[in-house]
């Protein structure tokens, strides 16, 4: 049976769109990419096929989505040299698990995975960045690494300490490892305060991108200088008032839900007034429409409503904190588990050269760039 995705009708800044929702796989790169193409005005000209695919449908299959994106890829001005069959092979990986490698200076290690986003002219960003302004010492030790590179150093450091292993750069490994371990522990959500600021700077107002965070991918949008992620959880499919979640904090403690027009909302369902003109969480006893006397029951009901909203928001924060804890535990345990001999052998073997797969345009010169310079001049349109 083919994998399927539910669709949802949303209104964003007064315009109607249909988006795709995640399934049990979670927030995957395929859905994040597809939704940018579906709702971004900058991509409307080249995204007519995917818009036709979802129009009038309650569900879309993985095969339909991949076939449509592949057709769009070869027709895209950036895809003149693209092999459709090879594109059909890699696009499903955006659903099953995309192997990307964020670098702690704000960029990504280049490769075929990055070329997918270039093909569709969709930016991919992350905020897992070390703060070079307030912690220059840590920046010197951390910014030159990617996540996979950091894991390799931690494994090698473990081998040096436990098994007296020797590497060509053992001194450098032992010097950098404590800073890397500390940084990973302090950024369990794969997002830092400095990274949040960086994201606000590089995204143009009312622009879209794909955000990598917590080993997941989501559709990111900038509105009035603030960042929002598209809500694709099928739990909220019937909630027309929940379309966005703000991205104001690294742990979700300050994040809240918004309508498609960026009006704050709540997990609690809103109730329509008798006139059908207004929606509110609590009826206003001082409204001109309330011609009766205000009773103690009304006041208590209002207070209960406020408490329910706070409880719902606290639940959302706790769920986010649990996810952050899970990610932190995975990272803390990962480097030790990888210290087994077969992992050591894998790290010591020459890495596979991603240039060999030439089915997509790939600029391998990224390896030669200056890693100690944060890409603040890279603006996502």
Swiss-Prot record:
Keywords tagged on the record: Cytoplasm, Nucleus
Origin: domain of life: Eukaryota
InterPro entries in the cross-refs: MINDY, MINDY_domain
Location within or outside the cell: Cytoplasm; Nucleus
Additional record remark: Present with 7620 molecules/cell in log phase SD medium.
CC per GO annotation: cell periphery; cytoplasm; nucleus; plasma membrane
Biased composition (Basic residues): 372-381
A Pfam short name: MINDY_DUB
Protein's name in the database: Uncharacterized protein YGL082W
Polar residues bias: start-end ranges: 331-340
Start-end of Basic and acidic residues biased regions: 342-354
Region annotation (Disordered) ranges: 331-381
Organism in which the protein naturally occurs: Saccharomyces cerevisiae (strain ATCC 204508 / S288c)
